[in-house]
Amino acid sequence: MAHSKAQRRGLLIILSSPSGAGKSTLAKRLRAWDSDISFSVSATTRKPRPGEVDGQDYHFVTVESFKQDVANGDMLEHAHVFGNFYGSPKGPVQTAINEGRDVLFDIDWQGAQQITNSDLGKHTLSIFLLPPSITELRRRLESRGQDDAETISRRMQKSWDEISHWGSYDHVLINEDLDETEEALKTIITATRLRRIQQPSLIEHARALQQEFEDLS
């Protein structure tokens, strides 16, 4: 990478899409591309699925504990989805961006708005993935073989609510080809890391230039 962790402030990279549009696959590819991108491990009140590891896939917590964290301001964002609570613990995110590491969020539009409006919002980069078509979106959901017909129908009904908020994101990509979309994401992230606000060391550099100019005058 062009800028080391010591030279920049980390990004909160928000990746949103309706279920089946490819965000989980692309999130994994981005983490494989750059070790400075870590995945935000969400807290949830739902039961663990087979193979899921507490603290790695999710932080599995009780409803009471979750609500207490929200009340204490310890959740960067939170939502109630399909009968369960989900949220992003704030502490680990704050630590990561202060150390120059990016944090990737695989969340819906409601969570994206909460993060963007938070005290860390100025460091966000939000990207929305659109499917090529609704027909293709359904085909992808069915081909995954993870959900029954009722769950797929419910996800499809929710998909338009998610898609309708595409205009509130910094960047929007149509994910027709995974490889092309991955390259576009890398380009966006690389450019955003160069924003002035992500490079606090520029202030000292500018002061040094001013001092040098005055010394030479």
From Swiss-Prot:
The entry's keywords: ATP-binding, Cytoplasm, Kinase, Nucleotide-binding, Transferase
Q: Which GO terms describe its molecular function?
A: ATP binding; guanylate kinase activity
Is Kinase one of the keywords? yes
Annotated ranges, domain Guanylate kinase-like: 10-190
Catalyses: GMP + ATP = GDP + ADP
> What SUPFAM superfamilies does the annotation carry?
P-loop containing nucleoside triphosphate hydrolases
- Class in the EC hierarchy, top level: transferase
Q: Quick check: keyword Nucleotide-binding in the entry? A: yes
Positions annotated to bind ATP: 17-24
Task of the protein:
Essential for recycling GMP and indirectly, cGMP.
Write down the NCBIfam families for this protein, in alphabetical order: guanyl_kin
| Family membership noted in the UniProt record | Belongs to the guanylate kinase family.
Q: What is this protein identified as?
A: Guanylate kinase
